[in-house]
Curated annotation (Swiss-Prot):
The keyword Cytoplasm applies. This is Type VI lipase adapter protein Tla3. Interacts with the Tle3 toxin on one side and with the H2-T6SS component VgrG2b on the other side. It is found in: Cytoplasm. Pfam families: Tla3_C, Tla3_N. InterPro entries: Tla3_C, Tla3_N. Its main location: cytoplasm. It comes from Pseudomonas aeruginosa (strain ATCC 15692 / DSM 22644 / CIP 104116 / JCM 14847 / LMG 12228 / 1C / PRS 101 / PAO1). One of its GO terms (molecular function) is identical protein binding.
Length: 480
């Protein structure tokens, strides 16, 4: 065996794709594949995309009304998303993590929480969710500058590609996006009342933010091949399901292990078993971003110029997708009409997509409500599900920025071949499961004690006490 086989890669070519290794999503009362299923039921009932409404329940009884119960629902949703996205991932390895929330300006007057409190709270956000998510053996390592506060965070995706290129030893990254009424309240000024956001006691206010949380793991699986050379020499733990490295066995490797920034210890054979069990759900293609403003005046392009720019971007982004995109997930936010600009652009690009067909056209705000800063990642998650299950390709277009459009291709790892198994079921541990019902084939279990958060009136609690302080509750079985 060459000594080179024992060393990590030291350079990286330009990357055009990253593998989607895991996804987890909570969206209002839905979890994981329930969202895609609800969208398909809509399509079957209404073929015309313009006439499709929201999948969110219209019955106010489906939602909690007290402030405590609203906070409880938010806590469950954010923990469920992390559990679904991380539970089958490699344990004991600190996965580099990016946290994405809505825009926040520390210089805003009269903030609800001090900048120091907010920075600290966001920095521990994902790690603190491990316990309520039942992820006791998983490890989180925040990336430097890995807290992203941005209302239109699709730029994170290009940054991920650059990160992998700059760090050839990096095998995977977790992106955790968290949006909702509670997050909006925590990051806002006191001049914005919690009542206006829908965060206090009372029925749900139509048009308020949709709670949307996504855990997305992307990576390059081949980058751990050098660790396979060391694995046979690692000690087998007394608890054989424990993947942690606790030293060498009776034999030492012929080449000294040298830690890297992202691989501080050798991986055991059990760790590699967990890694190799991860499916590749999709290929995430490098985003294509184009300006929608005139280079001289800064004014937004209009009519033919806008159509030509969007058409050129579509051709570039879809060139690497095989087959051509079968559907488009797009989001212009509230009070926007993306179809008016997209339809002529796709026509000019000679795309076969029919954006008036509900099976091919998904306006995220129209169908899911306002998912805010989580929108690009909700689109990627849905595109991953759709393309994996159908063996085809999808396109995601965040369009909330008026000065720029971003196109993100998602393709099946096995084009033209539909899988036998659907991996997007709601498989939550009973002690952390949401009230959506027991996991498939699971025996009914008694309701577990619930954990909730509250913001005492008139008290300036730290952000983590608003979002993460724990209060036992056994008198309300949340249906969310």
């Amino acid at each position: 065996m060459s000594a080179d086989a024992y060393h990590p890669p030291t350079t990286s070519p330009r990357l055009e794709t990253l593998d989607v290794l895991s996804i987890g999503m909570s969206l209002d009362v839905f979890r994981q594949g329930q969202v895609w299923k609800a969208l398909q039921e809509q399509n079957a009932a209404q073929a015309e995309a313009l006439h499709v409404g929201s999948i969110l329940p219209m019955d106010p009884k489906k939602y909690p009304t007290s402030a405590d119960d609203k906070d409880m629902a938010y806590e469950k949703r954010q923990a469920d998303a992390l559990e679904l996205g991380l539970k089958n991932f490699l344990e004991k390895w600190p996965i580099p993590t990016v946290t994405v929330v809505r825009g926040w300006d520390p210089s805003t007057p009269n903030l609800r929480f001090t900048p120091e409190e907010t920075r600290e709270s966001l920095s521990v956000k994902v790690n603190d969710l491990r316990v309520p998510a039942g992820l006791h053996w998983h490890r989180i390592a925040n990336l430097q500058d890995g807290i992203i506060c941005n209302d239109t965070p699709e730029g994170v995706l290009e940054a991920l590609f650059s990160l992998f290129e700059r760090n050839p030893d990096l095998p995977a990254v977790l992106v955790y996006a968290n949006e909702g009424i509670s997050m909006a309240g925590a990051l806002s000024s006191r001049d914005v009342t919690l009542k206006s956001l829908g965060a206090v006691s009372g029925p749900r206010i139509p048009g308020t933010l949709t709670d949307a949380m996504v855990a997305l793991i992307v990576g390059r699986p081949e980058r751990v091949d050098w660790l396979r050379q060391f694995a046979p020499y690692t000690k087998v733990n007394e608890n054989r399901i424990d993947p942690e490295f606790r030293g060498w066995g009776w034999r030492k490797p012929p080449v000294e292990f040298r830690p890297t920034p992202f691989i501080p210890q050798p991986w055991t054979e059990r760790a590699l078993e967990q890694w190799d069990a991860l499916p590749v759900l999709a290929r995430l293609h490098r985003p294509v971003s184009v300006p929608l403003t005139h280079p001289d005046t800064g004014e937004r392009l209009k009519r033919e110029a806008l159509t030509a720019q969007l058409a050129a971007a579509w051709k570039t982004a879809s060139a690497g997708l095989r087959p051509a995109p079968a559907r488009l997930f797009y989001d212009g936010g509230l009070n926007a009409t993306p179809l008016a600009e997209l339809t002529p652009a796709l026509g000019a690009a000679q795309s076969s997509l029919d954006l008036l067909d509900s099976r091919e056209s998904y306006d995220l705000t129209q169908r899911l409500g306002d998912t805010g800063a989580a929108s690009p990642f909700v689109g990627i998650t849905l595109a991953t599900m759709a393309s994996y299950l159908n063996g085809d390709s999808s396109m995601v277009m965040p369009l909330r920025r008026k000065d720029q459009a971003t196109l993100i291709g998602i393709s099946s790892p096995t084009p033209g071949k539909k899988p036998v198994h659907d991996p997007f079921g709601v498989d939550l541990l009973p002690q952390t499961a949401s009230g959506d019902g027991p996991p498939p084939s699971a025996d009914p279990v008694a309701p577990a004690s619930r954990l909730t958060t509250r913001l005492p009136p008139g008290e300036d609690y730290a952000l983590e006490e608003f979002l993460s302080s724990l209060k036992p509750s056994t008198d309300w079985q949340d249906d969310l």
